[in-house]
UniProtKB/Swiss-Prot annotation:
GO terms for molecular function: acetyl-CoA carboxylase activity; ATP binding; carboxyl- or carbamoyltransferase activity. It comes from Histophilus somni (strain 2336) (Haemophilus somnus). InterPro entries: Acetyl_CoA_COase_a_su (IPR001095), ClpP/crotonase-like_dom_sf (IPR029045), COA_CT_C (IPR011763). Coiled coil: none annotated. Keywords: ATP-binding, Cytoplasm, Fatty acid biosynthesis, Fatty acid metabolism, Lipid biosynthesis, Lipid metabolism, Nucleotide-binding, Transferase. GO terms for biological process: fatty acid biosynthetic process; malonyl-CoA biosynthetic process. This is Acetyl-coenzyme A carboxylase carboxyl transferase subunit alpha. Pathway: Lipid metabolism; malonyl-CoA biosynthesis; malonyl-CoA from acetyl-CoA: step 1/1. Residues 33-294 form the CoA carboxyltransferase C-terminal domain.
Length: 317
């Protein structure tokens, strides 16, 4: 996968381009030794990357959350879990490809995985509806969660959506009802639920698989009731004010952790999760295992009581 750079990363991109050019020259003519210059530029690039990512603002984090090369749910399933078996359909209307789910093993322990999937190529993005689920997607998710409860399996969800699909067909089939039902049912499921925002956490589309006992966010993910562009369009009548909106919305992992709306922030590799899938997956796996170990200590009554108190605490300082 070719590396793509965001606008604020352009100085880094220029250095990386110079490094690649020098490598190409060195490979074409073995008599030319450019190792020292390449090493110098690599060091400079690493320092610039460190400096850039130490001071990202909320709008830049929003761009990172949407990075086209960012790992999606299926990438984490491939890197973290074994024996994944896809389960499809809501048993009522269709199999929504914007939601993927199924049975897998985490360190030999059976779990149920559910997550949004955006797609990379144009064809796959259309197939996945750009990660925006319809009601049948959320009903599929609920079916899998209820199956997990029957077999006493922990539920692990990965959140990455700009929001639930707002199309006419989705509304006709009960989009708001499907989301609301998931919120209610997830609050009462008798098995541990671990939710992780891996990219965009957009409004009710994210919440519909986001009620749990542990709520985590990747370092450069976002979680909000609306996109910065949408907020800017409403408040300032212009999407051009998106960067201002992002700052006031408090959508970053660090801000939400300060507000105690999430439990932990999972560190990303320098430059973002897309720079190193293996490192990111290892960091996420460690968090999931630690959360499962923590929740395993609780009996069912305590688990549900803690989840209820978490939900009731939202909105209170």
């Amino acid at each position: 996968m070719s590396q793509e750079f965001l606008d604020f990363e352009l100085p880094i991109a220029e250095l990386e381009a110079k490094i690649e050019a020098l490598r190409s020259v060195s490979q074409q003519d073995q008599q030319i030794n450019l190792d020292d210059e390449i090493t110098r530029l690599q060091k400079k690039s690493a320092e610039l990357t460190q400096k850039t990512f130490a001071n990202l603002d909320a709008w830049q984090v929003s761009q990172m959350a949407r990075h086209p090369n960012r790992p999606y749910t299926l990438d984490y399933i491939e890197h973290i879990f074994t024996d994944f078996q896809t389960l499809a359909g809501d048993r009522a209307f269709a199999d929504d490809q914007a939601i993927v789910g199924g049975l897998a093993r985490l360190e030999e322990r059976p779990v149920m995985i559910i997550g949004h999937q955006k797609g990379r190529s144009i064809k796959e993005k259309v197939k996945r509806n750009f990660g925006m689920p319809a009601p049948e997607g959320y009903r599929k998710a609920l079916r899998l969660m209820q199956m997990a409860e029957r077999f006493n399996l922990p539920i692990i969800t990965f959140i990455d959506t700009p929001g639930a699909y707002p199309g006419v067909g989705a509304e006709e089939r009960g989009q708001s009802e499907a989301i609301a039902r998931n919120l209610r049912e997830m609050s009462m499921l008798k098995v541990p639920i671990i939710c992780t925002v891996i990219g965009e956490g957009g409004s009710g589309g994210a919440l519909a698989i986001g009620v749990g006992d542990k709520i985590n966010m990747l370092q450069y993910s976002t979680y909000s009731v609306i996109s910065p562009e949408g907020c800017a369009s409403i408040l300032w009548k212009s999407a051009a004010k998106a960067s201002t909106a992002a700052e006031v919305m408090g959508l970053t992992a660090s801000r939400l952790h300060e507000l105690k709306l999430i439990d932990s922030i999972i560190e990303e590799p320098l430059g973002g999760a897309h720079r190193n899938y293996d490192t990111m997956s290892n960091n996420l796996k460690k968090r999931l295992l630690a959360d499962l170990a923590d929740l395993d200590k609780l009996d069912q009554e305590t688990l549900l009581d803690r989840r209820y108190k978490r939900l009731m605490s939202y909105g209170y300082c």
